[in-house]
């Protein structure tokens, strides 16, 4: 009978190690919650907590005081529920597909009702069960994605019976430009939200996403639902595609701590002569004798093909440029600047960490941090740690 991998064996066998700092996650939640109090602060944990593992991340937010958790799909909520205590509430942002209403009610999960059809379906179930059912009601205030349109809202107000069957816990909307403090769309959406609320019986409301929590008290209402800021990304800087600045100037503006590091293992080091081509298509040609190293991660692991011949890894303070095309399972680095013998089979290089932020990698990929974060695949060895005061405690 074979024995299961130990944690050390899993780490060694994987192409890379994704280290997630649960203490930093709790810090980020607490920092936002404290700053916007007495507004309640929820945590958005959709897409498996932005790829970091909802079953580990959501309990960390719970320990920091969070009791409200937003996911995108009902299946995500059902899967996460066993990892949270009974006083936690799960909300489904995308609402419900027809035929799933009974399961949602049975599990005690609250849907966000985004259309008149979803409202009608939820109210119909309430009628069959003979009781009001709790839900959130979303309005479209300018994003044109989810939420009741102005016409649907008018029709809803005309149907008193329909409204009477639903226990509306929050009226919500979503900011399209919350990460751009000077964008006039924010004020227009706030005005629309305020006008809609004035036409309803007094209800708790929610508007602010991560960026919205930095726009001022008028955006807070009764519940905020930050997402990307909890995961270490300053919402005002996530779209910064300018050249890298000095490392000391990269500190987040809003007391948000980075929550992850990513390292990859070297699987081969070789010397090549001038004129040697590297990778598929031979898109990189050595302009002289050089030393190259291949690492065991690729676009299947969230390091996109757009990093080909740009971007880098680090070993200590030394930048190691990516050369050639990114493959599915490997990336090649120029390591000529390191002394011979520094890197060998099994050595680790930094892809995300103190020398290179997640935002830097996203910029090199011509994308946003969300896309990189949620694409980090399940082939990494995942290590969850608590880092406090310079010390590290590792958890399985």
Swiss-Prot record:
PROSITE patterns: ALANINE_RACEMASE (PS00395). GO terms for molecular function: alanine racemase activity; pyridoxal phosphate binding. SUPFAM superfamilies: Alanine racemase C-terminal domain-like, PLP-binding barrel. Catalyzes the interconversion of L-alanine and D-alanine. May also act on other amino acids. Belongs to the alanine racemase family. Keywords: Isomerase, Pyridoxal phosphate. Pathway: Amino-acid biosynthesis; D-alanine biosynthesis; D-alanine from L-alanine: step 1/1. One of its GO terms (biological process) is D-alanine biosynthetic process. The modification N6-(pyridoxal phosphate)lysine is found at residue 46. Its cofactor is pyridoxal 5'-phosphate. It comes from Brucella abortus (strain 2308). Pfam families: Ala_racemase_C (PF00842), Ala_racemase_N (PF01168). The keyword Ribosomal protein does not apply. The keyword Nucleotidyltransferase does not apply. PANTHER family: ALANINE RACEMASE, ALANINE RACEMASE, CATABOLIC-RELATED. Substrate binds at residues 145, 328. Its EC number is 5.1.1.1. It catalyses: L-alanine = D-alanine. It comes from the Bacteria. This is Alanine racemase. GO terms for cellular component: cytosol.
